[in-house]
């Protein structure tokens, strides 16, 4: 496992970093603050594998990897994974967990913009899950992900729609009624409409291939994928020729 740390603080919301650093030690607690991420991870992984025609042997970058839940799961199925994040504590947790499990993942503390400048067209697959709504300029993240992927490669985004339903479900419901995540986890003003995300995608060499919603049923306590993108949603894009970037 190789590590690299670079000090660069552009397009970083320190409040968001601090928020996740404060609970980083419990990242791999299946019943803790990150329980929803553990619950949805099989759905995310299956979607990525199916849309990218498998991950075995592919170079994958997980942008905003946090404590490494998705990163490790992709490495477990044979991908060569690099996890990128600006949170020092979550990365330390990710590195320790990788050592414990023996699943190799390279973790780097850096911004995606800087990583894109250093490693253009390096990866077969780039994932950016539950991260866009936590940065000052999400469109910059989209552009950088586009630069990092090889021509023909796949980029996956997931975020939260900005509307009253999403606010009620994720802020009122998940934070205050069901206590699924810590209070203050979400800032509804930073939620991103699908039309906004797709407009940023269209400004790059990426082309949207699929969009799917992620749904939680509080009665059955189950997550599932479905066409409705009113709340949580994922977008699969594929790169064309990067020469114009």
From Swiss-Prot:
Keywords: Methyltransferase, S-adenosyl-L-methionine, Transferase, Ubiquinone biosynthesis. Its EC number is 2.1.1.222, 2.1.1.64. Pathway: Cofactor biosynthesis; ubiquinone biosynthesis. S-adenosyl-L-methionine binds at residues 44, 64, 85, 129. Belongs to the methyltransferase superfamily. UbiG/COQ3 family. It holds the Pfam family Methyltransf_23. This is Ubiquinone biosynthesis O-methyltransferase. InterPro entries: SAM-dependent_MTases_sf (IPR029063), UbiG_MeTrfase (IPR010233). It comes from Proteus mirabilis (strain HI4320).
């Amino acid at each position: 496992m190789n590590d690299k740390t670079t000090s660069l603080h552009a397009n970083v919301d320190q409040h968001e970093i601090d928020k996740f650093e404060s609970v980083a030690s419990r990242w791999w607690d299946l019943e803790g603050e990150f329980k929803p991420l553990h619950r949805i991870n099989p759905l995310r992984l299956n979607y990525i594998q199916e849309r990218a025609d498998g991950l075995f042997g592919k170079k994958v970058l997980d942008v905003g990897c946090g404590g490494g839940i998705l990163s490790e799961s992709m490495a477990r199925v044979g991908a060569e994974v690099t996890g990128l994040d600006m949170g020092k504590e979550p990365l330390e947790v990710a590195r320790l967990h990788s050592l414990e499990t023996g699943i190799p993942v390279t973790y780097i503390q850096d911004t995606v913009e800087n990583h894109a400048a250093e490693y253009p067209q390096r990866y077969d697959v780039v994932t950016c899950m539950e991260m866009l709504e936590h940065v000052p300029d999400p469109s910059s993240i989209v552009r950088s992900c586009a630069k990092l992927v090889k021509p023909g490669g796949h980029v996956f985004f997931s975020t939260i729609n900005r509307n009253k339903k999403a606010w009620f479900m994720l802020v009122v419901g998940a934070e205050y009624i069901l206590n699924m995540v810590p209070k203050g986890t979400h800032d509804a003003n930073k939620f991103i409409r699908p039309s906004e995300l797709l407009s940023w995608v269209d400004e790059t060499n990426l082309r949207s291939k699929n969009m799917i919603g992620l749904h939680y049923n509080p009665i059955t306590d189950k997550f599932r994928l479905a066409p409705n993108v009113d709340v949580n949603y994922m977008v699969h894009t594929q790169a064309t020729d990067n020469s114009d970037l």
